[in-house]
């Protein structure tokens, strides 16, 4: 079990490090993403409306062998007082007026009166498709899965979809 925690810790600290590429520093350019959606939509007994935010500092973008990688930080709350805060990385794939953005972010989950996900440490994997309306505005739809990777006694996971602005 200690080996599992060691490798998870190693992944969390090494993945966003300078080992993956050079830092691209530009103007003070930050993105704030606001989203609303349905948490755990695939479980009729536990689904709940969610509201969240995500911050991206484009000054910290890195061009790597994996493409353009950027750190992200965010969180959401559900109508059942569950909360999740996270920090991780996203990959931005430019497709003209559209962007395809997969991301991965470990975070801390508090169930409140919502779904018990089995552990405080949860991992969010997400895909997002955005349409660029102006230089500073995107509309997007995204899907994510939050899971504890079997760190806890149970690992039900939660599937969510969101609309992003």
PLM segments and residue spans:
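Outer-membrane beta-barrel "beta-signal"
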Residues: 47-53, 156-165
């Amino acid at each position: 079990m200690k080996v599992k925690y060691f490798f998870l810790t190693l992944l969390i600290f090494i993945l966003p490090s300078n080992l993956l590429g050079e830092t691209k520093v530009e103007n003070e350019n930050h993105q704030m993403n606001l989203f609303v959606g349905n948490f755990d939509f695939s479980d009729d007994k536990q689904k709940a409306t969610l509201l969240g935010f995500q911050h991206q500092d484009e000054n910290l973008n890195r061009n790597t062998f994996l493409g353009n990688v950027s750190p992200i930080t965010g969180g959401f709350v559900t109508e059942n007082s569950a909360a999740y805060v996270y920090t991780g990385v996203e990959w931005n794939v430019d497709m003209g007026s559209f962007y395809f953005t997969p991301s991965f972010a470990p975070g801390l989950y508090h169930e409140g009166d919502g779904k018990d996900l089995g552990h405080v440490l949860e991992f969010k994997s997400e895909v997002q498709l955005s349409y660029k309306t102006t230089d500073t505005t995107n509309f997007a739809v995204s899907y994510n899965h939050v899971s504890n990777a079997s760190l806890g006694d149970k690992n039900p996971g939660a599937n969510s979809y969101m609309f992003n602005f």
